[in-house]
């Protein structure tokens, strides 16, 4: 394949969009596979493996000159550490919520983070909420209520388990919003790019996660055997590694998508991606398919599309040039992700 063909492929909008969706779905499903394994209770270990694999993967990609990011600097690491600590809180609460809730319900409730972030931007960054954005928020809340109702009606789990799942989901929405808003401010001060952010986030989270797994999780032989039974050990470890690589894929394809299309297109893709993600959860994990669950998924999907359109209109009013692909410097995917809330995951 000649360089001209490779160049055409790299600039095609279809491949990065599909790649982003596949990476996002793959990460969520592999996480759910591990967390739904019978008796699995070592969430911090899972997150440690993911972060370690992620750092190793982007290190290899940097050596191959596929990507580039800053070399480690102790001063920058000290300045960035609080963000990584918030990241640990966010990904741990996300893992607990995903452990107790079905993939469709988890996906729908993640929309609520967008609302918290939007009003956080109003308070701290001078943002504003338009009527159409407010309407999309109403749809998000409605879809979450319908999803919770359908989940409670059809769930075979004990009510205590469901309550735990929704409690972790609320905590995840709050920690997710805190992480995104704090990271936005730090990015402005450090001028970090996508892979700078990814490198420091994952590298600095590793020692925190190692301490948490060593001191809060049961490392007895019996519990290790329960978490990694001989007949499923390889599959669980492979899923852990794949989820770590998928997080790299999400970051890379996010930047790629923004570069060859526009930040608006990226926002829309994030909204549209919720539908196949929810459907994948129904297909692969036998989540109950009821009128309520399907209605909630459709409402969540529509709310995401309306939100993306609202953000597109705001961007158009702010700077007409930015709605045209390749007519401006690419927006940092991490910054855009902050506006639109995705575990990348």
UniProtKB/Swiss-Prot annotation:
Care to name a GO molecular-function term for this sequence?
Answer: GDP-mannose transmembrane transporter activity
A single BP term in Gene Ontology: GDP-mannose transmembrane transport
Transmembrane segment boundaries: 9-29, 41-61, 79-101, 105-127, 132-150, 162-182, 195-215, 234-254, 265-285, 289-309
Lumenal topological segments: 30-40, 102-104, 151-161, 216-233, 286-288
Q: Which InterPro entries match?
A: TPT_transporter
Bilayer topology annotation:
Multi-pass membrane protein
Looking at the keywords, is Membrane present? yes
Which regions of this chain are Cytoplasmic-facing, per the record's topological domains?
A: 1-8, 62-78, 128-131, 183-194, 255-264, 310-345
Q: Where is this region: Disordered?
A: 319-345
- GO CC term, one of those recorded: Golgi membrane
UniProt entry keywords in alphabetical sequence = Cytoplasmic vesicle, Endoplasmic reticulum, Golgi apparatus, Membrane, Sugar transport, Transmembrane, Transmembrane helix, Transport
Main subcellular localisation: Golgi
* Signal sequence bounds: none
The record's subcellular location field reads: Golgi apparatus membrane; Cytoplasmic vesicle membrane; Endoplasmic reticulum membrane
For bias type Polar residues, the affected ranges are 329-345
Q: What does this protein do?
A: Involved in the import of GDP-mannose from the cytoplasm into the Golgi lumen.
User: What is annotated about its quaternary structure and interactions?
Assistant: Homooligomer.
Family statement: Belongs to the TPT transporter family. SLC35D subfamily.
Record's protein name: GDP-mannose transporter
**The organism's lineage?**
Eukaryota, Fungi, Dikarya, Ascomycota, Taphrinomycotina
């Amino acid at each position: 394949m000649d360089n001209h063909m490779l160049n055409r492929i790299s600039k095609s909008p279809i491949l990065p969009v599909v790649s982003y969706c596949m990476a996002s779905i793959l990460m969520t499903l592999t996480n759910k596979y591990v967390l739904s394994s019978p008796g699995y209770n070592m969430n911090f270990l899972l997150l440690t493996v993911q972060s370690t694999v992620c750092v190793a993967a982007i290190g290899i990609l940097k050596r191959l000159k596929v990507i580039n990011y800053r070399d480690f600097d102790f001063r920058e690491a000290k300045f960035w550490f609080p963000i990584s600590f918030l990241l640990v809180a966010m990904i741990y609460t996300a893992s607990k919520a995903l452990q107790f809730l079905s993939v469709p319900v988890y996906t729908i409730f993640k929309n609520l983070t967008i609302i918290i972030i939007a009003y956080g931007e109003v308070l701290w960054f001078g943002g504003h909420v338009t009527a159409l954005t407010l309407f999309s928020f109403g749809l998000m809340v409605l879809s979450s209520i319908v999803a919770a109702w359908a989940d409670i009606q059809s769930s075979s789990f004990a009510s205590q388990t469901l309550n735990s799942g929704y409690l972790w989901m609320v905590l995840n929405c709050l920690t997710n919003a805190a992480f995104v808003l704090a990271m936005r401010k730090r990015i402005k001060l450090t001028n970090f790019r996508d892979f700078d952010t990814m490198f420091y986030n994952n590298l600095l989270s590793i020692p925190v996660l190692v301490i948490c797994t060593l001191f809060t999780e049961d490392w007895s032989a019996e519990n290790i055997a329960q978490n990694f039974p001989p007949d499923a050990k390889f599959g669980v470890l492979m899923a852990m590694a794949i989820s770590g690589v998928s997080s790299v894929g999400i970051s890379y394809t996010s930047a790629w998508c923004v570069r060859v299309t526009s930040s608006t297109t990226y926002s829309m893709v994030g909204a549209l991606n919720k539908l196949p993600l929810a459907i994948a959860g129904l297909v692969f994990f036998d989540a109950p398919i009821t009128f309520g669950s399907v209605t909630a998924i459709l409402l969540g999907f529509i709310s995401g599309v309306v939100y993306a359109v609202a953000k597109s209109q705001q961007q158009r009013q702010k700077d007409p040039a930015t709605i045209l692909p390749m007519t401006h410097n690419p927006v940092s995917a991490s910054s855009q992700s902050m506006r639109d809330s995705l575990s990348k995951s």
